[in-house]
């Protein structure tokens, strides 16, 4: 499989599966290491805050440009309709104001905030399409208040320690304190894992913030999916180059992720792009 093909780091995504399955996979990697006298790094990727819509009665709806659509933090979880859907992150109305732009499902759906009415976010659809259950929500330009480390992440850090992970990646850090907290929790759990900061929030790009994040981390990941949605795709290539240069200048490794060689999912050779 991929181990024989020469992979040198395995990423375990805490957004999926459970502790038992994660530990079983890692045991397979460690067994392969011993049998082949090699080293394969184990990177365990924390899920981070889930800022998502809830689900629809019919699992999906088709939104058209100009439609009025409401995100309602008090709507029951599975009762979304053509005109409204619940949200898992109950603080979202407090983070927004009229004129904000929300991007759903990695930017496929674009909503303009018209008004905040208590628990309801009233919006107009600027870019429509099919919206299905549990899709992510981003705020153009950043500014959502969700903490980078959730209670689930803190539990998963103990799993990473149990698995003797080599690296732990923290999702959506806003400042260096998020990295320091992750390192502290790892140390308390008995882990020597190095911490990787996934750069995917607009706030993390500020000069003083990104420099301190890089200093506190063993390496960074340019998470082009969420970052591109927050800052806009036209800004992404320049920021990607900037982050790579900053990491190298500080003697930190850097991973560039999301849609890298994606064509090779279905093709044995990459495109020229």
For each predicted feature, which ranges?
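Non-catalytic helical/linker scaffolds that mediate oligomerization, partner binding
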Residues: 1-273
């Amino acid at each position: 499989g991929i181990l024989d093909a020469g992979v040198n780091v395995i990423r375990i995504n805490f957004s999926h599966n459970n502790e038992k399955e994660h530990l079983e996979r890692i045991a397979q990697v460690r067994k392969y290491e011993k049998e082949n006298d090699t080293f394969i790094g184990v990177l365990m990727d924390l899920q981070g805050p889930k800022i998502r819509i809830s689900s629809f009665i019919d699992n999906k709806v088709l939104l058209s440009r100009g439609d009025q659509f409401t995100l309602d933090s008090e709507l029951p979880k599975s009762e979304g309709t053509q005109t409204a859907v619940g949200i898992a992150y109950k603080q979202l109305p407090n983070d927004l104001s009229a004129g904000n732009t929300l991007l759903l499902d990695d930017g496929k759906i674009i909503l303009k905030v018209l008004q905040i009415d208590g628990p309801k976010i009233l919006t107009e659809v600027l870019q429509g399409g099919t919206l299905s259950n549990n899709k992510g929500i981003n705020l153009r330009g950043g500014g959502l208040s969700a903490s980078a480390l959730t209670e689930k992440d803190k539990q998963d850090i103990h799993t990473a320690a149990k698995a003797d992970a080599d690296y732990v990646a923290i999702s959506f850090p806003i400042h260096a304190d998020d990295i320091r907290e992750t390192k502290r929790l790892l140390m308390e759990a008995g882990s020597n894992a190095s911490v990787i900061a996934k750069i995917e929030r607009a706030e993390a790009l500020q000069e003083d913030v990104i420099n301190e994040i890089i200093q506190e981390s063993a390496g960074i990941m340019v998470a082009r999916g969420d970052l591109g949605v927050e800052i806009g795709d036209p800004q992404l290539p320049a920021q990607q180059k900037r982050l790579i240069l900053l990491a190298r200048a500080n003697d930190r490794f850097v991973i560039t992720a999301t849609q890298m060689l994606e064509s090779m999912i279905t093709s044995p050779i990459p495109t020229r792009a």
